[in-house]
UniProtKB/Swiss-Prot annotation:
CDD domains: LolA. It is found in: Periplasm. Belongs to the LolA family. GO terms for biological process: lipoprotein localization to outer membrane; lipoprotein transport. Residues 178-203 are annotated as: Disordered. This is Outer-membrane lipoprotein carrier protein. The keyword Cell division does not apply.
Amino acid sequence: MKKMAIACALLSSVVASSVWADAASSLKSRLDKVSSFHATFTQKVTDGSGAAVQEGQGDLWVKRPNLFNWHMTQPDESILVSDGKTLWFYNPFVEQATATWLKDATGNTPFMLIARNQASDWQQYNIKQDGDNFVLTPKASNGNLKQFTINVGRDGTIHQFSAVEQDDQRSAYQLKSQQNGAVEPSKFTFTPPQGVTIDDQRK
């Protein structure tokens, strides 16, 4: 009986691993259908009790695997740009820009996961699929991300995604007007404006 229980446990583990692998493959396959796009987005952040913390909006340009421009326009402007090698974060309000190597950037943020769509990133998560919804739970529990959900259609269109942090703060993003196709190369370059303080962490 004990051997049977162990065998059943092992079988369940194998089946679960297969399901997670299939879900990861399906998610990557769907995202791969669109190599570049532009979309507008709205953001809503709530705390652990569900109370609203912040609402915002902006524009997003992506050219996979490593080019993207995340431009938050409200409530405060901020820009996150990758030129394929360097990741720039610019805050106009404080007039500061930070430069880091993209290869050193964390892969456990929802936006980075979507923008890069790399198999090595998805392997860090247990993924469950329910129709167009994919729920990701980190295999390691030492990060700040508790759960990540993305809704992406069979045609590769991303409708929404959300992230829940360890303190249950939830950030939800609704994407609208996704336009698939070539993106102007200038969207993936960044030149710090004159007078801006630069924190270069690439050294």
